[in-house]
UniProtKB/Swiss-Prot annotation:
GO terms for biological process: protoporphyrinogen IX biosynthetic process from glutamate. CDD domains: NAD_bind_Glutamyl_tRNA_reduct. This is Glutamyl-tRNA reductase. It catalyses: (S)-4-amino-5-oxopentanoate + tRNA(Glu) + NADP(+) = L-glutamyl-tRNA(Glu) + NADPH + H(+). Possesses an unusual extended V-shaped dimeric structure with each monomer consisting of three distinct domains arranged along a curved 'spinal' alpha-helix. The N-terminal catalytic domain specifically recognizes the glutamate moiety of the substrate. The second domain is the NADPH-binding domain, and the third C-terminal domain is responsible for dimerization. The keyword Nucleus does not apply. The record marks 97 as: Important for activity. Catalyzes the NADPH-dependent reduction of glutamyl-tRNA(Glu) to glutamate 1-semialdehyde (GSA). Homodimer. NADP(+) binds at residues 187-192. Keywords: NADP, Oxidoreductase, Porphyrin biosynthesis. GO terms for molecular function: glutamyl-tRNA reductase activity; NADP binding.
Length: 418
């Protein structure tokens, strides 16, 4: 048996191709059931995200092309469309690849943690479809523990490398417990949505969303349980916000120094943390002159991100060493499993010979043969049968002058070396 990792990702395929090769929730179970019925395939897990689609299989050696052909048939793709984008990894490299993916080492954003949750979800789908057991099950469980070890033993996840995450991380410097804060999000685009997700991960439950049009703001509000307002209403609610994060396409500032000053008075000068991600600025630069207002811009965040990316790169190098260690440990276990069937077959063969000779000896005793003679005959026949194959191997090695093989056979048979 062999392990296979086959797929495409953001490095090898365009968004258009990744969309065509993706497995949605409506077809993933059917796909798993189909995949494990392909010739030679015994186990399968399908990982499908916006940045990658990968098939992990336990299968007979040489069956990788069958998996590729199945992928093409399932999605109705021509070979020419995917051949240049597909990568395949076997055994040790397949194990290393999965571990790297689980640790975020192969992600678009180095070290991002979301991929681990996505892999766990993919593994759960495979379990529900009864598509995973044995070696592949052990591999995924091992990969989860490797990802946890990397997070614990390195700083790969400790530093913000996206604007949205950096904005929230800065908030944690001002407020040790973000769950106790109320946040005003100005804008309703992709960056603000990511900010909202990071805030929710920090257990922030009180959010306000202000946007030029209410429709988009209401979509965010429904997902995050936020209060909705127009940009014109910001002055009425600004004093409620401990944190303000703004990212709009407005050509002019939305929040001015006077507006913040009035809000601070209403807050009895309780500190307010403001992050302006927009270009051009949403918040007047003069706000930073207020003693209880802490204003950061996208330039401040970019400097933090660059420093943190270097930290992550150093941590990634440490993580790669951990991955290699854990891969070697897993492969030691995996190779040992190959001997289990061999040992079982060898024991079964020996037991079969012993049972046959025992029955023959018992029959001789029933027919009146002397017990000592019957036992001696059984022992002689049993010895001859059990040493027949090793004897043939020794004779063949000696005839060929293969001293290395003779030495190995001596070791295997427990004979003293000359």
């Amino acid at each position: 048996m062999s392990l296979l990792a086959l797929g495409i990702n953001h490095n090898t395929a365009s968004v258009a191709l990744r969309e065509r090769v993706a497995f949605g929730p409506d077809c993933i179970d059917r796909a798993l059931r189909e995949l494990v019925t392909q010739p030679g395939v015994s186990e399968a897990v399908i990982v499908s995200t916006c940045n990658r689609t990968e098939l992990y299989c336990s299968l007979e050696k040489g069956q990788g092309e069958q998996v590729l052909h199945w992928l093409q048939r399932f999605h109705g793709l021509d070979a020419a469309e995917v051949v240049s984008a597909i990568y395949q990894h076997q055994d040790e490299e397949a194990v290393r690849h999965l571990m790297r993916v689980a640790c975020g080492l192969d992600s678009l954003v180095l070290g991002e943690p979301q991929i681990l949750g996505q892999i766990k979800q993919s593994y759960a789908h495979a379990q529900q479809s009864e598509a995973v057991k044995g070696s592949l099950e052990r591999l995924f469980q091992k990969s989860f523990s490797v990802a946890k070890r990397v997070r614990t033993d390195t700083e790969i996840g400790a530093s913000a490398v996206s604007v949205a995450f950096a904005a929230v991380s800065l908030g944690r410097r001002i407020f040790s417990d973000l769950s106790q804060t109320k946040v005003l999000l100005v804008g309703a685009g992709e960056t603000i949505e990511l900010v909202a997700r990071h805030l929710r991960e920090q257990n922030v439950t009180r959010m306000m969303v202000a946007n030029r049009t209410l429709q988009r703001a209401q979509l965010l509000a429904e997902e995050f349980g936020a209060q909705v307002m127009t940009l014109e209403e910001i002055p009425d609610y600004l004093h409620e916000a401990d944190i303000v994060i703004s990212s709009t396409a407005s050509p002019l500032p939305i929040i001015g120094k006077g507006m913040v000053e009035r809000a601070l008075k209403a807050r009895r000068f309780k500190p307010m943390f403001l992050v302006d991600i927009a270009v051009p600025r949403d918040i007047e630069a003069e706000v930073d002159e207020l003693s209880d207002a802490y204003l950061y811009t996208v330039d401040d965040l970019q400097g933090i991100i660059e420093q943190n990316l270097e930290t992550r790169k150093r941590a990634a190098a440490e993580a790669e060493i951990i991955v290699l260690e854990e891969r070697d440990e897993f492969m030691g276990w995996y190779r040992s499993q190959h001997s289990v069937d061999l040992i079982r077959d060898y024991r079964h063969q020996a037991q079969q010979v012993a049972d046959e000779e025992l029955q023959r000896a018992l029959l001789s005793l029933q027919q009146g043969e002397n017990a000592e003679q019957a036992l001696k005959a059984m022992a002689h026949r049993l010895t001859n049968k059990l040493i027949h194959a090793p004897t043939q191997a020794l004779r063949q090695a000696a005839a060929q002058g293969d001293h290395h093989q003779l030495s190995r056979l001596r070791q295997v048979l427990g004979l003293p070396q000359e």
